[in-house]
């Protein structure tokens, strides 16, 4: 419903073709009754984990500050490796999500057959669940690393 309302507000020419183009362009974002249920499931997982990207960026910044502090004040600290590992895990999950987002839309738009789209969506559902798990794990590792080190 919001896609249609959005299109009505933004369709200055009022043509049906223009509205259809807008609906196609924005159906990927809204996922409302235009895409198959499996697509909507995938987008629900995406929408669930996307806000965590901010958490990842915040944790990466905190870890970078700790690493910089260690290198200046305690170059032989045993914690440096822990911070670097946690940062690498966050970078991996960030890269996985970014790569998935770019690949998903590009690939989905090129598939024309319903069976091909379904196969693709089955594969992508597993992939986004894996990314979700990686993000949760990397956030947990980084949070625990920051919390369990005596450095302030």
Describe these PLM feature segments:
Residues 79-128:
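Long, amphipathic, charge-rich alpha-helical segments that form helical bundles/coiled-coils
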Residues 17-26, 62-73, 99-120:
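Short E/K-rich amphipathic alpha-helical oligomerization segments
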Residues 4-7:
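C-terminal motif of bacterial Sec signal peptides marking the signal peptidase cleavage site
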Residues 63-65, 69-80, 87, 145:
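Extended amphipathic alpha-helical interaction segments
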Residues 11-65:
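Immediate post-signal-peptide N-terminus of mature secreted/exported proteins
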Residues 32-53, 113-152:
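C-terminal amphipathic alpha-helix
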Residues 54-61, 65-68, 95-109, 133-136, ...:
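Charged/polar positions within long, soluble alpha-helices
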